[in-house]
């Protein structure tokens, strides 16, 4: 017993030297390379095989018989995978098993937990690399480079850097001790279980949402997006092969409604790690608040969410035109604008607009749109029919509106896949519909402002959208940059200067926004991990108290 207690305390202090994390180098998959050959083979394998994916509870694969399909979004007549949806009975079992598994997992020393995730990182970089890339490309519509920076590089970075951040947290101790006492901070996981709900657009996010709380000693129930089940299943298998014990992370594809009914109404619900739409997050937030008022929970659940965005590029008339154009083409249209950080509105000074317009139009027309596993494609299809219909509705609105003009793109074709051309809308009104509302597709709306109204337009940029995720200022004038800082300090949780508003790197740019974009708990940093632990202060006194009285009470005259 004493030895076990010693090991637990060791985990709180995290004295072991961990491997120093560095950002995972990205491969280019150039013609003739072995990497390109192996990735193409993996894509061909998944195109010609339908994978059947179970739920996993307590380490056991469970097939409920309620089967749904994940399609290849750029070729939607082809089924990439089938998956079994968790039902009410299974969700109840998952909660019970999680709570049964909790004590043993959280008692493992930090080094032992870390070893699981560090090994998983190496497995994703070797054995599982091409499978997770190919499944992300076909299932989620990512071209090879977009899959590489997500499913390989970012996913691996999350696993490695989170271990470093966790160690730094555990090493934080009170800086002072009064004479005769010792002060200790210990860090323990939350009292119940954590629910992870992940989106379709980043395989790495699904991995981080589930693994970050688990690294800190929590048990997790993970609901992956139905349009990203295959890639998420592959990273889950890597975690299991790395030694993740049964019951630590339960894998539960299925209905968001059922998850809400059964996982958020339980006394042991202690945290939510979420990435998805603002509307869904608001619904969950309200549900948990209502349950809290009703006395359902033991304590206050930790609610962590990264949601929508209406991200911007703002060009000052001193800005480098070529740099702005190239960063905007990438920021707006890579991955079909389906990054929560994607540039979807831009503000351009009138004096620079003619040359920028020509370059943007030329750039968009040169983009090849095709199958995601065609290595010459720059963009591919959007994720599903609902997304296609939503994006198309904004394009049709612009075509019919006297306040907007489509200057390039605008075609939509769902005959083979959910293809939407990269589209640029010129808005006469800075509050035009597509300047304000999140679209989540390859649609960029531009407002051209008078050069003399720079500050006025910055104010409009700040007040236009309810979101505050990412944004960029392009300028070579330091005064203009500082002015933008002043006006936009609350408009973007990740703010870029002369760079695109996408592409945050783990360990370099912690990611998250505020307002309607989420709780700004900064994935890829220790700030996020702090949400998954509860700190406990311990004071030990070494000097016995010999009297309860104080010196002021002693009167020598009495």
Curated annotation (Swiss-Prot):
Q: Where is this site: Transition state stabilizer?
A: 201
Q: Which residues does the annotation say bind NAD(+)?
A: 198, 223, 276-280, 438
Top-level taxon of origin: Eukaryota
For this record, the Gene Ontology CC terms, alphabetical, are: mitochondrial matrix
Question: Where, by residue number, is the active site?
Answer: 306, 340
Among the record's GO biological process terms, what is one?
proline catabolic process to glutamate
Q: Which family does it belong to?
A: Belongs to the aldehyde dehydrogenase family.
Spell out the InterPro entries in the cross-references.
Answer: Ald_DH/histidinol_DH (IPR016161), Ald_DH_C (IPR016163), Ald_DH_CS_CYS (IPR016160), Ald_DH_N (IPR016162), Aldehyde_DH_dom (IPR015590), P5CDH/ALDH4A1 (IPR005931), Proline_metab_enzyme (IPR050485)
Q: In which pathway does it act?
A: Amino-acid degradation; L-proline degradation into L-glutamate; L-glutamate from L-proline: step 2/2
Q: Does the keyword DNA-binding apply?
A: no
Query: What does this gene product do?
Result: Irreversible conversion of delta-1-pyrroline-5-carboxylate (P5C), derived either from proline or ornithine, to glutamate. This is a necessary step in the pathway interconnecting the urea and tricarboxylic acid cycles.
> Which key words tag this protein in UniProt?
Mitochondrion, NAD, Oxidoreductase, Proline metabolism, Transit peptide
| MF (Gene Ontology) | 1-pyrroline-5-carboxylate dehydrogenase activity
UniProt enzyme class: oxidoreductase
A Pfam family for this UniProt protein?
A: Aldedh
The organism named in the record is Dictyostelium discoideum
Q: Reaction catalysed?
A: L-glutamate 5-semialdehyde + NAD(+) + H2O = L-glutamate + NADH + 2 H(+)
What Enzyme Commission number(s) does the record list for this chain?
Answer: 1.2.1.88
- Report what the protein is called: Delta-1-pyrroline-5-carboxylate dehydrogenase, mitochondrial
Q: Which Gene3D superfamilies match?
A: Aldehyde Dehydrogenase, Chain A, domain 1, Aldehyde Dehydrogenase, Chain A, domain 2
Subcellular location as annotated: Mitochondrion matrix
Q: Does the keyword Thylakoid apply?
A: no
Write down the CDD domains for this protein, in alphabetical order.
Answer: ALDH_F4-17_P5CDH
């Amino acid at each position: 017993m004493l030895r076990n207690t010693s090991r637990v305390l060791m985990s709180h202090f995290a004295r072991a030297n961990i491997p120093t994390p560095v950002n995972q180098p990205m491969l280019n998959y150039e013609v003739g390379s072995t990497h390109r050959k192996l990735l193409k083979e993996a894509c061909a394998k998944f195109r010609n095989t339908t994978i059947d994916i179970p739920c996993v509870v307590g380490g056991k694969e469970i097939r409920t018989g309620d089967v749904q399909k994940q399609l290849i979004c750029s070729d939607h007549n082809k089924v990439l995978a089938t998956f079994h949806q968790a039902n009410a009975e299974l969700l109840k079992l998952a909660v019970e098993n999680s709570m049964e598994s909790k004590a043993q997992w959280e008692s493992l020393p930090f080094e032992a937990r870390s070893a699981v995730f560090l090994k998983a990182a190496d497995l994703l970089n070797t054995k599982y690399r091409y499978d997770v890339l190919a499944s992300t490309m076909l299932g989620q519509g990512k071209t090879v480079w977009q899959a590489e920076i997500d499913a390989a590089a970012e996913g691996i970075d999350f696993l490695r850097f989170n271990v470093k951040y966790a160690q730094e947290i555990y090493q934080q101790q009170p800086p002072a001790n009064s004479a005769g006492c010792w002060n200790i901070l210990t860090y323990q996981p939350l009292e119940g279980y954590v629910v992870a709900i992940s989106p379709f657009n980043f395989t790495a996010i699904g991995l981080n949402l589930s693994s970050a709380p688990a690294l800190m000693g929590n048990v997790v129930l993970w609901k992956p997006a139905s349009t990203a089940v295959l890639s998420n299943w592959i990273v889950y298998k890597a975690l299991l092969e790395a030694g993740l014990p049964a019951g630590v992370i339960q894998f539960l594809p299925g209905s968001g409604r059922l998850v809400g009914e059964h996982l958020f109404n339980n006394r042991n619900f202690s945290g939510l790690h979420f990435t998805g739409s603002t509307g869904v997050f608001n619904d969950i937030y309200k549900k948990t608040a209502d349950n809290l008022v009703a006395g359902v929970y033991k304590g206050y659940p930790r609610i962590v969410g990264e949601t929508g965005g209406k991200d911007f590029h703002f060009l000052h008339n001193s800005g480098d035109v070529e740099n702005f154009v190239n960063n905007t083409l990438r920021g707006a249209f890579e991955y079909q604008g389906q990054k929560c950080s994607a540039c979807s509105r831009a503000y351009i000074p009138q004096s620079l607009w003619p040359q920028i317009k020509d370059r943007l139009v030329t750039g968009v027309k040169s983009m090849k749109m095709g199958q995601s596993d065609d290595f010459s494609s720059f963009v591919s299809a959007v994720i599903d029919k609902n997304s296609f219909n939503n994006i198309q509705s904004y394009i049709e609105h612009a075509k019919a509106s006297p306040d907007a003009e489509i200057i390039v793109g605008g075609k939509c074709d769902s005959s083979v896949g959910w293809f939407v051309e990269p589209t640029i809308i010129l808005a006469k009104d800075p509050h035009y519909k597509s300047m304000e509302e999140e679209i989540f597709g390859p649609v960029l709306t531009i407002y051209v402002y008078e050069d003399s109204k720079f500050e006025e337009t910055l104010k409009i940029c700040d007040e236009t959208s309810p979101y505050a995720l990412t944004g960029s200022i392009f300028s070579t004038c330091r005064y203009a940059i500082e002015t933008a800082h002043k006006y936009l300090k609350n408009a973007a949780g990740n703010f870029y200067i002369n760079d695109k508003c996408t592409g945050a790197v783990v360990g370099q740019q912690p990611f998250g926004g505020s307002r309607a974009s989420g709780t700004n708990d900064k994935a890829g940093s220790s700030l996020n991990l702090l949400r998954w632990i509860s700190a406990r202060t311990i004071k030990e006194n070494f000097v016995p108290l010999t009297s309860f009285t104080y010196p002021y009470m002693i009167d020598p005259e009495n």
